[in-house]
Amino acid sequence: MHADDTWFKPELNKKILKELSRRSDWEGFKHFGIYFLFLFLFGFLTYLTWGSLLTLPLLVCYSTIWAYSPSNWHETLHRTAFKNKLLNDIFYYVSSFMANMEPVRWRWSHTFHHSHTLQTHGDYDHEIQLKRPTDLIHFFCQFIPFGQLIYPHKTLQFEILKHSMGYLTDVVKQNAPEKEKSIIIRNSRLFVFLWILIISLSIYYSSWLPIFLFLVPNYLGAPL
């Protein structure tokens, strides 16, 4: 049994679709301005209350806002957040780091995903949430804070680590052009460098704060 891309496709009014697809730099700045305003606000409050009883609820709020970054990633990947291509790409790379999604790998795999959604026959759609064979325990762990760490080898960070060492996963071999693979490796190494820098800051300042502000939010906030 397999899934392919043959299914019902509704008719769309092209004029209405064009109106809905209109892009605006102002709307993009407004969205990201509000987003980062609240992210910085709750991050600053977490810093001020670090070690007190108020830390946990503020950190949960901060992490939940941070974990919205995949939505920002998705819109900037499609270049719909802004009218300007450069602005989309800048915020795409920022959102990619926040979401632990190496930008070049995901640009190509997401393009394939939209062309062959849920395809399991032949070339595989690697963005399927429930892969075959299905692991329901792993699926439900996604809805528990830090549940992803029960399966560390299935996290996005582990994939980036493999790419940083030059080991290309099946999704890259299948979706990315040959000339892009070295860029994926380079970007992955940059991500790992930034992670090491954050951990080093925590060690230097003898504080867990940098780790909880930049590395933990996806594990804590995404399930919430």
Where are these predicted regions, by residue range?
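Post-HEXXH active-site segment of zinc metalloproteases
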Residues: F82-S96, L130
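Non-catalytic, topology-defining segments of multipass membrane proteins
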Residues: M1-S63, N72, F97-F212
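Hydrophobic transmembrane alpha-helices of multi-pass small-molecule transporters
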Residues: L39, Y93, A222-P223
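Juxtamembrane membrane-interface segments at transmembrane alpha-helix termini
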Residues: A67-T76, A222-L224
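Short active-site segment of divalent metal-dependent hydrolases/proteases
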Residues: L77-H78, T117
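Small-residue-enriched core segments of transmembrane alpha-helices in multipass membrane transport
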Residues: C61-W66, L213-A222
